[in-house]
Amino acid sequence: MADSGGIKVLSENRQARFQYEILETFETGIELLGTEVKSIRAGKVNLRDGFALVRNGEVWLHNIHISPHQQASAYYNHDPLRTRKLLMHREEIRKLIGKVEQKGLTLVPLKMYLKQGWVKVTLGLGRGKKLHDKRETERRRQDQRDIQRAIKRA
């Protein structure tokens, strides 16, 4: 899935768009170890349970599972669930702090991709959906599908 801008999507968190109403997105870099980069390039990453927190003026990514690299020994391999630092400009972090402190807003990873050889993460600022919101979204999506099918047949 290489796009024209040199972007290759490695992992996508489709569940996040179902569980959260995404209000804004941010592109961030991520601080990784060598074996983590190799595993990510092999597609061995899971963003599903991940979230980000702002602590001491830094953004940290939690609960992202990056599988240990197959060819590396146990001594040199990384901890799959370790907390990883996200790289953002100070101004972006300041804006983020104000928004995250609002009640009900959280940072979730939406996508991990390669951009010109660097691993990037797209963070989404989201508000959790209630069950009726999820049903409404699903209903709208189904109506769109029905409309498209009707247009195709006509």
UniProtKB/Swiss-Prot annotation:
Family to which this protein belongs: Belongs to the SmpB family.
Gene label: smpB
GO BP field: trans-translation
Cystine pairings recorded for this chain: none
Main location: cytoplasm
Species classification: Bacteria, Bacillati, Cyanobacteriota, Cyanophyceae, Synechococcales
Top-level taxonomic group: Bacteria
Segments of skewed composition (Basic and acidic residues): 133-154
Molecular function GO terms recorded: RNA binding
Native species: Synechococcus elongatus (strain ATCC 33912 / PCC 7942 / FACHB-805) (Anacystis nidulans R2)
Keyword Cytoplasm: yes
Entry protein name: SsrA-binding protein
Cellular component terms per the entry's GO annotation: cytosol
Keyword set, alphabetical order: Cytoplasm, RNA-binding
Role summary: Required for rescue of stalled ribosomes mediated by trans-translation. Binds to transfer-messenger RNA (tmRNA), required for stable association of tmRNA with ribosomes. tmRNA and SmpB together mimic tRNA shape, replacing the anticodon stem-loop with SmpB. tmRNA is encoded by the ssrA gene; the 2 termini fold to resemble tRNA(Ala) and it encodes a 'tag peptide', a short internal open reading frame. During trans-translation Ala-aminoacylated tmRNA acts like a tRNA, entering the A-site of stalled ribosomes, displacing the stalled mRNA.
Coiled coil regions, renumbered to chain: none
Family annotation (InterPro entries): SmpB, SsrA-bd_prot, SsrA-bd_prot_CS
Region (Disordered) residue spans: 130-154
UniProt key word Cytoplasm: yes
